[in-house]
Design a protein with these regions (language model features):
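Conserved, single-site charged/polar hotspot
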Residues: 5-288
Length: 288
């Protein structure tokens, strides 16, 4: 097998702690939620605690004029804020959309409709992306390639949805994200063993596009979007037995798994699908 020289650079960013904001819901009229442990609701505008939350209890937030109301044991109570944060007070999870999430929830009243955002550390976010984007039963090295590609996409696209108040959606419009409910021991291992690793080209983190399958030959960015991204070239995608699913640019997920079965490691898979890239490690200050 072809040997590769793995060069890891250290990227420095001004922000001392990298978190990401993921849009879970927009333009909704009610938000059921809960926490796995005791928690609080704070007014994000004043940082004042407005409600204490019991563990494993169901609650609901609705818009009320320009602020919000919370349903507690069948009764609604006004919360004089248009921007609240729901957070466990110790290690625990928050729940909405019938899923558990790490980090905390932010709910905003925007013109009488609610937006729900999961504020979460980057690595915890990637733990919820890998099993949502790639079957957990696939090869570990394919999961590692997926983790690095997903992390690169996320970092390169921070602020992409800033007009909506968050960075990325939780859907394949950006990256599928299932929160802590989607996590498995195997996919978490892939994330942890590649912690902080991203793909760069010309000292910039790349938007590492990927799709389910390319149907035998991947496409270039100019083929699909008319933009020239030199690290996205057309290569045999090792998924000939799978019909094309998705845009076909960058890494084929089925192809990545097939290469892993042939003995390629995660980094070799990435260097096959993304050309002239360097592996870089995010500043460890992010993880303090």
């Amino acid at each position: 097998m072809k040997k590769i020289l793995l060069i890891i650079m250290l990227l420095f960013f001004a922000n001392p702690c990298l978190a990401i904001k993921i849009g879970l819901l927009t333009d909704t009229d009610n938000v059921p939620f809960g926490t796995s442990v005791f928690g609080t609701i704070t007014d994000a505008n004043t940082n004042r605690t407005v409600v204490d939350i019991e563990a494993m209890q169901g609650y609901e937030i609705k818009p009320y004029n320009n602020v919000m109301a919370i349903k507690i044991k069948g009764k609604y109570y006004k919360i004089n804020s248009d921007n609240i944060v729901i957070k466990p007070v110790s290690f625990g999870y928050v729940c909405t959309k019938s899923k558990w999430y790490r980090g905390f929830l932010r709910i905003q009243n925007k013109g009488g409709k609610l937006t729900v955002i999961n504020d979460v550390d980057l690595e915890d976010y990637i733990k919820g992306v890998v099993p949502a984007e790639m079957p957990s039963g696939w090869e570990l090295e394919a999961h590692k390639a997926q983790a690095v590609a997903a992390r690169s996409y996320a970092v390169a696209n921070l602020g992409k949805r800033a007009g909506l108040g968050f960075d990325l959606k939780d859907t394949p419009d950006d990256q599928a994200y299932g929160g802590a409910s989607a996590e498995t021991a195997k996919t978490n291992k892939a994330v942890e063993e590649t912690q902080g690793i991203v793909l760069t080209h010309d000292m910039k983190v790349i938007t590492a596009y990927y799709s389910a399958s390319a149907g035998g030959q991947s496409l270039t960015a100019s083929d699909v979007w008319g933009s020239n991204l030199p690290y996205l070239r057309s290569v045999p995608s090792f998924d000939d037995n799978i019909g094309k699913k998705g845009h076909g640019v960058g890494m084929s997920q089925h192809g990545a798994n097939n290469l892993a079965k042939q003995g390629y490691n995660g980094y070799q898979i990435l260097q096959y699908f993304y050309k002239d890239v360097t592996f870089a490690k995010l500043n460890p200050e992010y993880y303090k």
